[in-house]
Amino acid sequence: QCAWNDEWNHFDEDKQNEIKARQGVRYPNLEGATIMDPETMKGMPKDGKTIGEIMLRGNVVMKGYFKDKAATDKAMAGGWFHSGDLAVIHPDGYVKIQDRSKDIIISGGENISSIEIENTLSKHPSVSIAAVVAKPDEKWGEVPCAFIEMVKDKPTSEKELISFCKETLAGFKVPKQVIFCELPKTSTGKIQKFELRKKF
């Protein structure tokens, strides 16, 4: 059941916020909801670290896409609905979404969550909005590149933001480039990452 556990009241505020940031557990009417490797279709360990794709199965999941067999076959491969959301599963069964599969950055064989980098950058006082996408790289295949909208009258620099990220992120997750610009958005304010990828 997705409900607050009284034992969590004893944790400090940071730990409680970390718990609240998780997305929850399997919906009772679902036959199955788990995290799997989309290639092997094997379940991921419940360690809160290993990233896999959220897979769903049950009579509340769609049967397929209207008149699109190819898309249906891809989405339902292996008898599970492939959500496109990448997540980890914790020992208590709670899931935390890390990224969309199309937004993950694969650098030197390592999967990097763009959301993790964006969350780090957003903690800097000069950053209003951050968006991170994969930039092609000859050596690593892809590397993180950050696009930043700054807070008005609070200037910063590429060097400062990279140093800021190095304080909390593993070296391979630190953006290799920071670009300051107005971010392209939809009418509802969602950042259009596909437009940012076109810049490379």
Annotate each PLM feature.
Residues 58, 63-64, 74, 86-173, ...:
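AMP-binding/adenylate-forming catalytic core of the ANL superfamily
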Residues 9-20, 142, 163, 197-199:
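Short alpha-helical interface patches
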Residues 178-181:
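General small-molecule cofactor/ligand-binding pocket signal
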Residues 1-94, 101-104, 117-118, 153:
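Conserved AMP-binding/adenylate-forming
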Residues 24-27, 77-79, 139, 174-176, ...:
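Short loop/turn motifs at secondary-structure junctions and domain boundaries
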